[in-house]
UniProtKB/Swiss-Prot annotation:
Gene: murI
Active-site residues, Swiss-Prot/TrEMBL: C76, C186
Name of the molecule in the record: Glutamate racemase
InterPro entries: Asp/Glu/hydantoin_racemase, Asp/Glu_race, Asp/Glu_racemase_AS_1, Asp/Glu_racemase_AS_2, Glu_race
BP GO annotations: cell wall organization; peptidoglycan biosynthetic process; regulation of cell shape
UniProt: substrate binding residues: D13, S14, Y45, G46, N77, T78, T187, H188
Annotated catalysed reactions: L-glutamate = D-glutamate
Family: Belongs to the aspartate/glutamate racemases family.
Protein role: Provides the (R)-glutamate required for cell wall biosynthesis.
Gene Ontology terms, MF aspect: glutamate racemase activity
Pathway: Cell wall biogenesis; peptidoglycan biosynthesis
Keywords associated with the record: Cell shape, Cell wall biogenesis/degradation, Isomerase, Peptidoglycan synthesis
EC number of the protein: 5.1.1.3
Amino acid sequence: MTTRAQAPVGVFDSGLGGLSVLRAIRAELPAESLLYLADSRHAPYGEKSPEYIADRTLRVCEWLVDQGCKALVIACNTATAQAVHVLREKLAVPVIGVEPGLKPAVATSKSRVVGVLATESTLRSEKFARLLAGASGDCKVLSQPGYGLVPLIERGDTHSPAVLELLRAYLQPMLDANADTLVLGCTHYPFLEDAIHEIAGDRLTLIDTGHAVARHLGRTLAAAGLQASGQAATPCFMSTGDVLPLQAMVAALLGEAPMAQRVDIGDAPLSPVAVSLASQPE
C-alpha cells in the first residue's frame, strides 16, 4: 500500500448536491478519505455557458489536485456534461463523472415512458444527446429542465410549497403521459425524493446513480493501485461561498456536525484551452 493510496479523493460539485454522491461513496468505500468542495459562490452552473462551466470546473479541479487528491469525482451532472473531457485531457489523476441514469431507467420501465429531470445545460449537452441516442431504445423519453430547484435546495428547502409547486408543474406532464420511471439527472435532486413521492406516490420509480458512481470509483482506484486501507480520515468540507448552508446540509444528510472551511479559488479570464476543449466531444 503506497502513501499515494492513502491520499483523499476529491468530490466536487457546483454546490451541495454532490453530498448525495459523497454519501454513496462513504457507504461503498468506507476506507477512502474524502475532500468535498462546493463551488457555491458560482452556483448554480446549470444555466451558465458551456465555456464558463468548462473553465471554472478545470480551475477548481486543478486546485483539488494541488491539495493532493489522488482522484476526482465530478459530482455534478452539468460539470460532467460540459467539462469531463477537459479534465481528462489536462489532469494526471483519474476523473469520474456522473451522468443521468438513462440506461437503468430504460431497463426498469414497464410502461416504456421515462422522465428525465435535469438542468438545462445537461439536457442541451452533446454528451446527453449521445446518451439519449444510445440508451433510449424503444422508450419514450420526456426531458424536463428543473428550473428554480437548485437554488431552493442550496438553501436547504426541499419540501416547501414553492418546491412542491415547481415539481408538480414538471412532473404532471410525465405522469399524464404514463411515465413510470424518473431519472434524477442532477445530484441535487435526490434531496427531493420525499417531495416527489408526495406528488407522484408510487407511480414513479426514481433512478439515482450515486451508488453506481461510487462502485465505478472503486473499480478505477483498484485498477490504478490506489485503493486505501484501514480507517478513513474524517471528511473535509470546503466551500467557495457561505459555509453555513454546507454545514447544515451535512448535518441533515450525514448526521454529523463538521466545521466547513471557506476557500478562495479565484476567477480569471476564460482560458483558451478551456474555451477550445469545451466545444469538443468527449
